[in-house]
Amino acid sequence: MLEKEYSFALYDRVDQLPAAWDELAAANIFLSCGYLSVLETSAPQNMECHFIGVFDGSELVAAALSQFLDLNSLESFGERDRCIKTSVRNFVFKRFSSHVMFIGNNMLTGQNAFVSGKTADYSSVLFALKAASVTLASQYRKRGKPIHLVTFKDFSESKADRFKTAGFSDYFQFSTQPNMVLEIRPDWNSFDDYIASLLKKYRDQFKRARKKSDGLEKRKMHLEDILQHEKTINELYHHVARNAPFNTFFLAENHFRTLKEKLGGNFLFYGYFDDGKLVGFSTLIKNGDVLDTYFLGYDESVQREKMLYLNMLYDMIAFGINKGFREIVFARTALEIKSSVGAQPVEMIGFMKHRNRLINKKLDRVFDYLEPKTEWQQRHPFK
C-alpha cells in the first residue's frame, strides 16, 4: 500500500523546470540543471532526454531523468568480439528492442535516475515515475516510435522491496556488471599513504606502471585546450568506444566542450602527451564528496607501451585523496584492473519490462543469453 499519491509533470527543456529543481538536485550533480543542460545540447545523436518532476500537491518532491534510445540509428554496437553470438545479440536488439526508454542515465553507472526530498515516500515516487514512463511511451507511440523496452536502472539491492510496493511485479529484476567503487580510507592523508597500504605485489605494480610512463606529460586542460584538441580528443574517445564489446550510444563531438562550459570547475579534463602529441585523456566529475570517473580515450599502442590506463587510475586516486573526497566511482568494465587498485564491486539492480507480453515473460532467459555473467577475479591489493 502506497503512503502517498503523487502527480508528475514532463519537461523537454531545462528552462521549463520548476524553480525548486536545483535545490532538490543539490545532492546529485547529474540531476542538476547544469548537467541536464549538457544532455539537452550535446546528447548522443540517437538519444532524447526528458525530465520528470514528481509533486505532492504543488510541492516538488522528486526530480528525475528519462532517456529514449533509438538503436536503429546506431551505426555499430561495437567492433570487438565479432562472433555468431554477438551477431545474434545485435539482431535481437535491433529487431525486438531497438526503442529503449530508461528512467535513469544510460551514460553513467549508479543511482542517477532521480533524487527525492527527505520527506518523500520512495515507493510513491517510483509509482509516479512508472506512470510517467507510460505517458512518455504513449507519446512516442503517437510519433511512430513504439517503446519496446522500459528500464529503471542502477539501484542498490536494498531498494528491491520498494519496487515491489510500487507495483513492479510484472517487471524483470536484473543485475549486470557491478559498479566499482573505491572508499577513501580516513588514514590516507596523502597518495603516499595509499601506496604504503598496498601489498608488495601491488606496490610493485604501481612502480612498474610509473616507470613505464616515463616520458608522458600529464596536463590539466581548460576549455580553450579542449577546443584546440577537439578533433584528436574525439578520435581517441572513438578508438576506445568502438573497441568495447557493446555500445548503445556514442558521445557527441561537442560533449566534452559543453561539459566544461556548463559545469566549469566541477568537470576536470586531463590530457596525456607524448613528445607534445595528445595520446590519451581522462575525465572526472565532482559530485559533492564523491568523485565520478567519466569517459576517457587513448592511443592503443601508447596504452600498451606506457601502461597508460593503469596510470590514469592511479592519477585519479591521487586526486581523490589529495582533494578530500569520500569515494571514487570507477563505474563498470575493466573490473579486474580496477580491483587491483582497490576498487570494490557494488552490485546494482534494475527493472525492465518489454511491451510484448510473451517476450516479457521470457526476459529472464533472454537476458541471461544477451548479457552473460562476467567472469573475473577480484583482487585484494591492501595489507
Regions found by a protein language model. Give the residues of each.
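Active-site/acyl-donor-binding loops of N-acyltransferases
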Residues: 2-5, 68-69, 111, 166-193, ...
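A conserved beta-strand-loop-helix scaffold within acyl/acetyltransferase catalytic domains
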Residues: 3-82, 148-304
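Glycine-rich loops and low-complexity Gly/Arg-rich segments
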Residues: 32-35, 77-79, 87-92, 139-140, ...
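Short C-terminal domain-edge/linker segments immediately following a structured domain
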Residues: 39-42, 83-85, 93-99, 181-185, ...
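Acyl-donor binding region in acyl/amide transferases
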Residues: 48, 71-170, 290-350
